[in-house]
C-alpha cells in the first residue's frame, strides 16, 4: 500500500528545520570553540558549505526519484544495489544514534540527573506513538516545537547583543588546521537534517518541485540562525565557552537576564524533541523502503491501512533507540552518528555525479566538493568513532551477504520442490 501524500512545502520546511535546530545548536558551541578557537567562523563556513553541497545533491536526486528512502533509493537507482544498501545502513544506524543523542539532550535540560535516563526513554516512546498516529500530526507537532525553539534562540541572540558591549571575554586561542576541520565536523552534526525531507518523497505534495525548494529554504534559514547564535556566544563568553556545559544559558546569565534562563532551557528541550521527532520519521521511512526492497525483513514494509504510516518500522526504530539511551552516553552517540551521516552524504554526492545531464539541476562541481568535504570531515573525527563506525558498516555488509545467501538457498529449495 503506498504512503499518502499530505505534506506541503511549509510542512517539509518545518521538518527540515526541526531536524537541524536540535541538540547541536544548544550543545555544539563549547566543543567547536575548543577545537577551532579563533577560527570558529571559518569552521562554521566550512560546515555550512559542505551541508549546502550535500543539500544540492540531495535535492537533485529527490527531484528525479521522489520515493521514500532518500540516498538509499537514489544510490540503488544511480549506482547499484550494494551502494544503496550501504547508504541505507549508514543512515539507519547513524541516525538511530542521533535519536539517542537528541533524547539524552532533551532529558539533560528537562530533568535532574537521577531522572534523565528514564525521561529520555519515555520521550522516545511518546514520539514513536505520535509518528504512528500519522504524518500530518507529526508535521504539525514539529512546527510547534520549531517555533518554541526559535523563541528561545531569539532570547539568546538578544541577550548576547545586550551583553557584548560591556563584556570582556577571554580571547579565543589560535587554531590549527586540524582543529578547524574538527570544529567543522562538530558543527556539521548541528546541520545534519536538511535531507530528512528527501526521505519522505512519497508523502510530499508535488515532490519534484517541493523537495528541492524545501531543502534550500530550510538550510538557508538555519545557517542564518547559527551565525547569530555563534556570534552571541563568542562575543559574550569568548574562550570560556569551550568549557561551558550549556553555553547558551551562560550567555543569558552574562546579560543579567536570569529570569529568562528557564526559557532557554525549555527551548533546548523543545528543539531536541523536534529533531528527535523528525529523525524517527526519516529512519522509519528508510527502514520501510529497505524492507520493501527485500533488504530487511518484509514485516517492516507493512503500512498501517488507516494511518498510512510504516508502523512496524517505526516501532523497531524506537525500540533500538531506547536500548541505546539506556546503555550509552551522549558523546559516544554523537561520534558514531557523525561517522554514519558523513558516509551517507558521501554516497549521495557520488550518486548525484552519476546522474545524466538532463537530470542535473546544479553544477557537478558542487557534488565533487560535497564528496571531498565529507571525506575530509570523516578523517577529522576521533579515532574511536571512526573505528566503531567502520566495524558497524562491515557488520552491515556481512549481514547482507548472509541474507542474500539464505535467500538464494531458499529459492533453490523451492525450485527443487
For the regions a language model picked out, list residue spans one by one.
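Hydrophobic transmembrane alpha-helices that form the core helical bundles
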Residues: 31, 52-132, 137, 268-289, ...
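Helix-loop-helix junctions that connect adjacent transmembrane segments
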Residues: 1-3, 41, 45, 114, ...
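Membrane-interface loop-to-helix entry segments
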Residues: 110, 116-166, 174-177, 215-219, ...
Amino acid at each position: 500500500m503506498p504512503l499518502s501524500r499530505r505534506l506541503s512545502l511549509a510542512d517539509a520546511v518545518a521538518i527540515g528545520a526541526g531536524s537541524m535546530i536540535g541538540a547541536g545548536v544548544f550543545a555544539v558551541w563549547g566543543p567547536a570553540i575548543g577545537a577551532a578557537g579563533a577560527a570558529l567562523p571559518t569552521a562554521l563556513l566550512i560546515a555550512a558549505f559542505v551541508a549546502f553541497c550535500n543539500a544540492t545533491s540531495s535535492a537533485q536526486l529527490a527531484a528525479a526519484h521522489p520515493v521514500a528512502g532518500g540516498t538509499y533509493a537514489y544510490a540503488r537507482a544511480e549506482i547499484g544495489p550494494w551502494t544503496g544498501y550501504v547508504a541505507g545502513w549508514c543512515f539507519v544506524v547513524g541516525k538511530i544514534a542521533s535519536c539517542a543523542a537528541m533524547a539524552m539532550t532533551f532529558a539533560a535540560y528537562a530533568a535532574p540527573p537521577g531522572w534523565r535516563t528514564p525521561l529520555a526513554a519515555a520521550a522516545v516512546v511518546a514520539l514513536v506513538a505520535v509518528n504512528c498516529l500519522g504524518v500530518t500530526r507529526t508535521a504539525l507537532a514539529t512546527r510547534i516545537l520549531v517555533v518554541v525553539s526559535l523563541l528561545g534562540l531569539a532570547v539568546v541572540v538578544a541577550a548576547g547583543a545586550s551583553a557584548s558591549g560591556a563584556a570582556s571575554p577571554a580571547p579565543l586561542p589560535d587554531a590549527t588546521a586540524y582543529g578547524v576541520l574538527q570544529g567543522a565536523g562538530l558543527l556539521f552534526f548541528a546541520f545534519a537534517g536538511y535531507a530528512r525531507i528527501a526521505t519522505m518523497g512519497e508523502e510530499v505534495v508535488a515532490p519534484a518541485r517541493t523537495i528541492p525548494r524545501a531543502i534550500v529554504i530550510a538550510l538557508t534559514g538555519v545557517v542564518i540562525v547559527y551565525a547569530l547564535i555563534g556570534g552571541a556566544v563568542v562575543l559574550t563568553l569568548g574562550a570560556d565557552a569551550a568549557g561551558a556545559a550549556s553555553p547558551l544559558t551562560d550567555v543569558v546569565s552574562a546579560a543579567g537576564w536570569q529570569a529568562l534562563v528557564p526559557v532557554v532551557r525549555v527551548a533546548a528541550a523543545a528543539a531536541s524533541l523536534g529533531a528527535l521527532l523528525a529523525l524517527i520519521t526519516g529512519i522509519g521511512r528508510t527502514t520501510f523502503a529497505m524492507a520493501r526492497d527485500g533488504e530487511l525483513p518484509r514485516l517492516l514494509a507493512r503500512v498501517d491501512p488507516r494511518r498510512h504510516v510504516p508502523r512496524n518500522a517505526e516501532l523497531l526504530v524506537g525500540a533500538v533507540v531506547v536500548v541505546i539511551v539506556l546503555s550509552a552516553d551522549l558523546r559516544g552517540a554523537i561520534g558514531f552518528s557523525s561517522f554514519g551521516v558523513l558516509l551517507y552524504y558521501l554516497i549521495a554526492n557520488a550518486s548525484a555525479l552519476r546522474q545524466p545531464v538532463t537530470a542535473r539541476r546544479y553544477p557537478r562541481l558542487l557534488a565533487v566538493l560535497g564528496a571531498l568535504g565529507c571525506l575530509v570531515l570523516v578523517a577529522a573525527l576521533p579515532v574511536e568513532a571512526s573505528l566503531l563506525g567502520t566495524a558497524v558498516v562491515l557488520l552491515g555488509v556481512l549481514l547482507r551477504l548472509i541474507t542474500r545467501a539464505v535467500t538464494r538457498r531458499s529459492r533453490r529449495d523451492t525450485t527443487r520442490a
